[in-house]
């Protein structure tokens, strides 16, 4: 038996933000990030709409990128004092993810973060509040998913929290909020969405419902991401819908080891963060090569290649064409092909911010953590410790995974 869960209501299109006026309640807390929603006037609009709905409104501002356990606990404490019956999270994936976790600790102050790490272990929510999510970036799709990614900085590990309980009640997908994204953010979030759709399509939990969403999202992203990156606002609007479709797919089919590796490398090194969407873009071609040793996965990758009009006479040729196309997209979007060329903020660089020796020293533990990640279970192949270490090396040095040893593909950076 499968389950397919979505928000009860999804408002989309220009001026969808005004649907906040339809929410019914007494108090709403609005959770936001670093200030872009305020600078661009969207936060004031949201507050005005909520007040028009008759609600008292409180703000929780300043959620950092890759939100921490500490931020989650602070937000939950504010919620317990204010006692909202609506939690409205707006911005990129970080404030929405943080607000999802705050929601659990608001309703159940006695639980611990460790209680929530096990997938699908959340207590029943909506005892005190409902949840509305409003994305301003076109990538994470957390507005329609059962996921929240929170970082434990003491351990240097990102944890994907997973439970259908944290699927928002209302999603507002207004493309106006995404039109101010800078180019680099457009690239990284777009390839994050592409990874969501591809991993959902080859997941061991895929089904007819998720397949349709994933394939259409892949085609839209393939057609529109570069145009959006170059400033085409119609393509930017299309990408906002495409990432949401990808989110509906992966929230129900789940993900794979591209995300496992991105979660466990993102905050693991002293040189700085590996931005999540950029990590996915770098790792995806290597993981496709690894997963394609499974015949079923290879056939599904080949189906993706055909769907976006790539050429190949055999399944293997189609898989290789898909890998080449994704690497080409990375080049067009100025995304590094490997960690060895990962510069500050995800720019291409001759010298990586991730020290090679530190990476190699931490390789066994990083591989172990990636294998244990919640996303690994639905990957088409279950990697051994040795295989995961080889994959991570491939991601550092720009190699394609082969057996018994990776093959150098470092011709383009």
Per-range role (PLM):
Residues 139, 248-257, 263-275:
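Glycine-rich phosphate/pyrophosphate-binding beta-alpha loops
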Residues 1-86, 339:
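ATP/NTP phosphate-donor binding region
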């Amino acid at each position: 038996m499968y389950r397919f869960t979505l928000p009860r209501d999804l408002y989309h299109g220009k001026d969808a933000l005004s649907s906040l006026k339809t929410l019914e309640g007494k108090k709403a807390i609005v959770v936001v990030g670093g200030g872009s929603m305020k600078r661009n006037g969207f936060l004031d609009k949201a507050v005005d709409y909520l007040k028009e709905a008759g609600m008292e409104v409180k703000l929780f501002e300043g959620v950092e990128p890759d939100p921490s356990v500490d931020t989650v606990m602070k937000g939950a404490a504010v919620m317990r004092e204010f006692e909202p019956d609506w939690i409205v999270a707006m911005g990129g994936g970080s404030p929405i993810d943080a607000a999802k976790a705050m929601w659990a600790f608001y309703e159940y102050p006695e639980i611990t973060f460790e209680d929530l790490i096990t997938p699908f272990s959340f207590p029943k929510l909506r005892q005190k509040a409902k949840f509305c999510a409003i994305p301003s970036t076109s990538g994470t799709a957390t507005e329609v998913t059962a996921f929240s990614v929170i970082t434990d900085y003491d351990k240097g590990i990102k944890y994907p929290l997973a439970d259908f309980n944290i699927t928002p009640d209302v999603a507002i997908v207004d493309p106006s909020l995404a039109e101010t994204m800078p180019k680099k953010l457009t690239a990284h979030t777009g390839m994050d969405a592409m990874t969501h759709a591809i991993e959902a399509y080859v997941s061991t939990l895929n089904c007819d419902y998720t397949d349709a969403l994933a394939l259409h999202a892949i085609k839209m992203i393939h057609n529109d991401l570069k145009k959006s990156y170059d400033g085409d606002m119609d393509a930017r609007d299309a990408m906002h819908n495409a990432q949401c479709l990808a989110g509906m797919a992966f929230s129900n089919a789940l993900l794979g080891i591209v995300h496992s590796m991105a979660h466990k490398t993102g905050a693991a090194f002293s040189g700085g963060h590996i931005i999540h969407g950029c990590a996915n873009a770098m790792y995806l071609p290597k993981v496709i090569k690894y997963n394609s040793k499974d015949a079923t996965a290879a056939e599904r990758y080949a189906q993706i290649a055909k769907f976006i009009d790539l050429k190949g006479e055999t399944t293997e040729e189609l898989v290789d064409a898909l890998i080449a196309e994704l690497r080409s997209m990375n080049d067009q979007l100025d995304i590094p092909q490997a960690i060895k060329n990962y510069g500050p903020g995800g720019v291409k660089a001759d010298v990586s911010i991730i020290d090679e020796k530190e990476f190699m020293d931490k390789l066994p533990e990083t591989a172990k953590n990636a294998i244990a990640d919640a996303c690994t279970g639905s990957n088409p192949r279950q990697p051994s410790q040795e295989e995961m270490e080889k994959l991570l090396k491939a991601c550092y040095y720009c190699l394609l995974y082969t057996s018994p040893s990776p093959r150098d593909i470092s011709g383009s950076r």
